[in-house]
């Protein structure tokens, strides 16, 4: 595994992608932003992924649940952390994700990522 963990960041808002990339890269992770569009999403080719941040409320024609299933199929060992303004993990996501962080709490986000990545490395 690489010494620098890579975090796949999935959101439909390019501003949020930029912000979360800055946050994860501020502590040495490598941010890999993927924007969800009406055409779907394109995962990076040949890039290792150690963890995934996934926005729960996507405005395009795909749900976070469907995206999480795609992520698990492509990166089965990468833990998924849901980012949301809701208060708890939705039932349909509970068995798929390993973390949940409310938006606006970068300290908790980084703590969660560090813990999950440390378990893998």
Please state what every model-predicted region is:
Residues 1-8, 106-121:
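Non-catalytic signal-transmission and effector/linker regions of two-component phosphorelay proteins
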Residues 14-32:
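Two-component/phosphorelay signaling modules centered on CheY-like receiver
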Residues 32-51:
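Acidic, metal-coordinating helix/loop segments flanking the phosphotransfer/catalytic sites
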Residues 45-47, 70-77:
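Conserved phosphotransfer cores of two-component systems
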Residues 52, 80, 100-101:
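Two-component signal transduction core modules
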Residues 54-69:
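Conserved phosphotransfer microenvironments
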Residues 83-84:
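Hydrophobic/aromatic residues positioned on beta-strands within the core alpha/beta folds
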Residues 92-101, 105:
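As written
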């Amino acid at each position: 595994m690489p010494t620098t963990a890579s975090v796949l960041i999935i959101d439909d808002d390019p501003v949020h992608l930029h912000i979360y990339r800055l946050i994860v890269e501020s502590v040495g992770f490598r941010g890999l932003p993927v924007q969800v569009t009406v055409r779907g999403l394109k995962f990076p080719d040949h890039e290792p992924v150690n963890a995934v941040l996934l926005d729960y409320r996507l405005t395009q024609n795909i749900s976070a649940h469907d995206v999480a299933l795609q992520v698990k199929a492509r990166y089965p060992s990468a833990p998924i952390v849901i980012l949301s303004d809701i208060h708890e993990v939705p039932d349909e996501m509970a068995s798929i994700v390993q973390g949940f962080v409310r938006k606006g709490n970068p300290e908790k986000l980084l703590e969660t990522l560090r813990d999950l990545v440390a378990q893998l490395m």
